Amino acid sequence: MSQLVYFSSSSENTQRFIERLGLPAVRIPLNERERIQVDEPYILIVPSYGGGGTAGAVPRQVIRFLNDEHNRALLRGVIASGNRNFGEAYGRAGDVIARKCSVPWLYRFELMGTQSDIENVRKGVTEFWQRQPQNA
C-alpha cells in the first residue's frame, strides 16, 4: 500500500485523526520554510480553512507542497476535513484540490472524525490502492 500525506494545523485535529487511523503517513510541516518531497504515490489528507469561500480553503503549506511538480505528480486522491457549520463549504479544500489536480475526492470528515470515519477511511484507502495499477 502506498502512503498518506497530511497537513495538520496547530489545532492538531487532523494529526489526531491520523494517529487513530494507524496507517503510514508523512506530515507536511507546519513551518512554511520546511519542505518535504514524496517518492511514491499518495493520498492527501487536508483540513479546510476559511469561512466558506474557495479562496483560502487550502492551507498555504499544502499549496506550497503541491506546487512542487514532483509531489503533485504522485498525488492519487484527496480526503478533506472540515466543519459542518460552513454548510456547502464543508471540506471545501478537498473539492479545490481534486479539481485542480484532477484526482478523486475520496472522503470528507468533520474536525477529528468519528470512529465510523476512521473505519470508512481505513477500508476506503485499502480498497483504493487495491484498484490502482501496480506502476501508478
Swiss-Prot record:
Source taxon at top rank: Bacteria
Molecular function per GO: FMN binding
Stored InterPro entries: Flavoprotein-like_sf, RNR_Ib_NrdI_bac, RNR_NrdI
One GO BP annotation of this record: protein modification process
Name of a matching Pfam family: Flavodoxin_NdrI
Physiological role: Probably involved in ribonucleotide reductase function.
Family, per entry: Belongs to the NrdI family.
Protein name: Protein NrdI
